[in-house]
Amino acid sequence: MLFAGFDAGQTRTRCRISRWTADGWMTVCEGQGAGVCHLDAPNGAARFRAAVGSSLKAALGQRDALELDAAVIGASGIEQGTELQHRAGDLIAQELLMPPDQVLATGDERTALHGAFPDSPGIVLISGTGMICIGRNDRGEEARSGGWGWLLDGAGAAFDLGHQGLQLSLRMADGRLPDHPLRQRLWKAMHCHSSAQVKAMVVNPDFGAAGFAALAPLVVTAAEEGLVEASHILRRSAHALT
């Protein structure tokens, strides 16, 4: 049995192809490609298929195409039991040229939970581009908290760190806060030279949550260097996850 698993976040998508053997699962190949966005967002369906296709291509490398027996994608923004989940399943089936009954699309939080705790109670807290917490009790009942999209519920995620860091940079540029190398680093990463350029950049549809999240490491570095305001951002984010 040849199985493809996809972990699709808003920043990148990872693909791993595994073969079932007498000794269990053996990894055949793996790679990563583009990230996804919400299916109802502009070009959402096209980006979803591109994420699957690009990560599969990266995993295969120079290999010939493999005939898959099953595929599962855990993707950011897929809500269990919704019409959106069915659409995502149809899209992965189309992209992989597989029958719909051989593929499954679900939320990445659920694949993480079942991967970490296949047959036991447990809790998974994900803080990536976005954030979500999901758990299962000893009766098999599952519950989730958070994960309602970066526009509504990003506290504790990389998106939120980058977003708040940019807010700091604008206050620095205005003179409302003392200037700090964080501002220059953030703007350099965005190829911006002014507050007006930053404002224009963040409303670009291609920037989105992943654009903010990519700036998060710079905020963490500034906190490690002693910037009090950056440290406050990290503490607020950590508290939001508890």
Give residue spans per PLM region.
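Short glycine-rich, Thr/Ser-proximal phosphate-binding strand/loop in the N-terminal lobe
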Residues: 2-47, 66-67, 141-143, 147
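Short glycine-aspartate micro-motif
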Residues: 3-7, 68-72, 122-126, 133
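Short beta-strand scaffold segments in enzyme catalytic cores
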Residues: 13-19, 114, 125, 131-136
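Short beta-strand-loop/turn "lid" adjacent to the catalytic site in phosphate-handling enzymes
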Residues: 37-40, 56-95, 105, 114-117
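Glycine-rich phosphate-binding loop plus the immediately following alpha-helix
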Residues: 40, 141-192
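Adenine-nucleotide phosphate-binding core of ATP-dependent small-molecule kinases
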Residues: 45-47, 51, 191-242
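Conserved phosphate-binding catalytic cores of ATP/NTP-utilizing and phosphoryl-transfer enzymes
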Residues: 100-124, 141
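Acidic-glycine-rich active-site phosphate/pyrophosphate-binding loop
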Residues: 131-145, 213-216
